[in-house]
Amino acid sequence: MDKLFIKSDVLLKDSFQLAWNVYESGFEPNYIIGVWRGGAPVGIAVQEFLNVLGIKSDHVAIRTSYYSGIGERKDSVQVYGLNYVIRQLESEDRLLIVDDVHDTGNSVAQIIADIAAACKKNTPEIKIATPYYKPNKSQTGNKPDYYIHEPAQWLVFPHELDGLSLEEIIENKPELANLIDKIKHHI
C-alpha cells in the first residue's frame, strides 16, 4: 500500500491555509466542529487563525466511529458528542465542519444528517473544510467546500502509529528516535 506520511509542520501549515481560504471566501462560521481525532488539531488551527482575523466562533470536537483498522470500515457511521452543538444552533448560524481527510464522505454526511434531523427548521448553513480530499473514494457525492490537496495514497498523519511497521516508524517518525529501543519489542 502506497502511504503518504504527513509531517506535523506541513499539517499545521495546510490548516492555516485552509483557514485563510475560508476567510477569503467570505464565509464567517460562528460554530466550528473539529471531527475527533484527526480533525481536532486541524480544527484548532482553523479556529485560532480565524479568531485572529476577527471571526469569533464557538468550537467543539465531536467523534465519529467508522474505521476499525487501516482500510477496514464498519457498516455504519456513529456520531458522538453533537448534543451541545444541536442545543445551540439556530437557522441563522454558520457551521464549519473540519476534518483531516474527506474520502468516502460518509462520516461528514452522517454528521450533517444528524444535525439536520435534530435541528429541523433550525438547521444552519453548513460548510466542510479539510486539508485532504479524495474524490475517487467518495461514496456520497459530497465535496468539501474548502480543501488543499487531492492525494491518491493512504494518508498517515503525524500522530498515527497503529498499523505501521517498525521500519516505517524508524524511517518516517523521527520524533520517536529516542524511544525506539524501548518500544520496538511492542511493535
Q: Residue locations for each model-derived region?
A:
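PRPP-associated nucleotide enzymes
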Residues: 1-187
